């Protein structure tokens, strides 16, 4: 007698997008990706090269979103746990800050939302709406089955229907708000999350072990063959992806061994573009073909010459600024090529020469500074180094450095002390839990890592035995079995 109630279940989602349901249909995976193009364009990590922290957060959130979308398409799935995501959204032509955080001076804003949808269409609409992006283009995806224009659909009365809890109890239907309400009532704790995800992580880690051994073998062979200092990756690609990149480099070495040996003593980094980095690492763009890589290795002697000139330029700037050391901190600065960084230094050096500001020789020895192209006022970082804008006023710069020099020395001393404590706690945590590996994402500070490890050591966590544990900003089981936990994980009372 209640058969007529089943179609009414879908009306619960009208609370979010009531005008779409008269003409909606199930989206395919390809259609969903196409519909999300404006979103991907607004959050793609490649557009955040000048902002490494925001870039990393977007990368991680995109991975979790991808898993969510994949699970939605699996046959027979019942329900998904609410997934909380954070994205930094670039200002685009169709972006609007209505109801959202305002854009920063860098041209992006942080958007946080929780996915608790049950199908691809409502998920796509929810994401676009959360980021204040247009949904007009999605109408074309429904024209094969429905020809009613969007503007007519919008004329329908927007009356959200909220069913009483007794309706779901009586019919046995799933309350779409139940999981979300539960999340708001009960925060995820470390022990509960490990209980729910530990076995899955162990299985993934076990499956990845052969590839991990292959990765280590390839890395050791290439490092020895080319006499490299190290081989690294800019992004957190999976083990299979990394092995594929090393196999590609190995094949190139077989064809052009003498050319590749020009990288002797260097660190090779697989990244988004080919060239030499600001600190002298050889960057191999993963989308480039062997021909581009070969040309890069052939040009290495000229890069080494530019690197020597860059070091001289850094020394000249240091001399003009009382002996302060010019450094480039990879974890905190945008990814720059050697040419880009040299140009930045050259502009700054010429401005200093023209201003003729005076510092007592060697009065600032032991201090450090980094150059930024997207700042307009100097600042002092908590780690003790100065953030100096390339185009800042030299007179203001002189006053700022002199007044903050003592505080900078104190910050640097605390940084060194904190680093020692951090390393000791990492070793202690690794030993106590018999971890195979304990590491952190670049955006996690030493203060956050110390706080995290101190609290971990107070726990009994048998699921961590033999695991790879990454301290991050969120909970996740990576594709190769690495466990990611937020640095401010909670067990009982919230950590503020």
UniProtKB/Swiss-Prot annotation:
GO cellular component term, pick one: mitochondrion
Pfam family, one: DUF4461
Subcellular location: Mitochondrion
Protein keywords: Coiled coil, Mitochondrion
Coiled coil start-end: 404-437
Mitochondrion is among the record's keywords: yes
Coarse class of the protein's main subcellular location: mitochondrion
Function: May regulate T-cell apoptosis.
PANTHER family in alphabetical order: T-CELL ACTIVATION INHIBITOR, MITOCHONDRIAL
Name of the featured protein: T-cell activation inhibitor, mitochondrial
Organism: Homo sapiens
């Amino acid at each position: 007698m209640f058969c007529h109630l089943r179609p009414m279940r879908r009306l619960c989602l009208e609370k979010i997008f009531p005008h779409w349901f008269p003409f909606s249909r199930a989206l395919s995976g390809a259609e969903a990706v196409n519909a999300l193009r404006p979103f991907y364009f607004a959050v793609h990590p490649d557009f955040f090269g000048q902002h490494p922290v925001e870039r990393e957060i977007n990368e991680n959130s995109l991975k979790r979103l991808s898993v969510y979308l994949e699970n939605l398409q699996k046959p027979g799935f019942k329900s998904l746990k609410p997934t909380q995501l954070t994205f930094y959204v670039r200002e685009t032509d169709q972006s609007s800050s209505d109801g959202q955080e305002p854009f920063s001076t860098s041209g992006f804003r942080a958007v946080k939302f929780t996915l608790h949808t049950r199908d691809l269409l409502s998920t796509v609409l929810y994401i676009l709406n959360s980021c204040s992006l247009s949904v007009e283009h999605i109408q074309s995806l429904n024209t094969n089955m429905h020809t009613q224009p969007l503007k007519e659909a919008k004329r329908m009365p927007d009356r959200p229907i909220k069913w009483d809890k007794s309706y779901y109890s009586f019919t046995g239907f799933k309350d779409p708000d139940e999981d979300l309400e539960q999340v708001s009532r009960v925060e995820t704790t470390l022990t509960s999350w490990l209980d729910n995800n530990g076995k899955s992580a162990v299985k993934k880690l076990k499956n990845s072990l052969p590839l991990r051994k292959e990765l280590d073998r390839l890395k050791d062979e290439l490092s020895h063959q080319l006499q490299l200092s190290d081989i690294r990756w800019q992004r957190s690609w999976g083990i299979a992806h990394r092995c594929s990149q090393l196999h590609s480099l190995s094949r190139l070495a077989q064809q052009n061994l003498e050319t590749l040996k020009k990288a002797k003593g260097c660190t090779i980094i697989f990244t988004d573009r080919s060239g030499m980095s600001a600190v002298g690492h050889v960057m191999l763009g993963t989308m480039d073909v062997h021909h581009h890589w070969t040309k890069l290795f052939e040009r290495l002697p000229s890069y080494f010459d530019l690197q020597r000139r860059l070091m001289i330029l850094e020394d000249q700037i240091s001399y003009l600024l009382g002996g302060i050391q010019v450094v480039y901190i990879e974890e905190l600065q945008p990814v720059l090529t050697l040419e880009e960084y040299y140009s930045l230094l050259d502009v700054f050096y010429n401005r200093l020469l023209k201003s003729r500001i005076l510092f007592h020789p060697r009065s600032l020895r032991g201090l450090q500074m980094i150059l930024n192209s997207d700042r307009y006022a100097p600042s002092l970082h908590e780690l003790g180094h100065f953030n100096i804008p390339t185009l800042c006023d030299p007179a203001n710069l002189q006053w700022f450095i002199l007044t903050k020099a003592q505080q900078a020395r104190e910050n640097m001393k605390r940084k060194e002390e904190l680093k020692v404590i951090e390393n000791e706690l990492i070793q202690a945590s690794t030993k106590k839990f018999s971890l195979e590996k304990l590491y952190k994402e670049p955006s996690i500070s030493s203060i956050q890592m110390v706080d995290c490890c101190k609290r971990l050591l107070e726990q009994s966590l048998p699921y961590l035995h033999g695991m790879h544990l990454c301290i991050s900003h969120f909970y996740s089981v990576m594709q190769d079995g690495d466990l990611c936990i937020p640095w401010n994980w909670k067990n009982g009372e919230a950590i503020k």
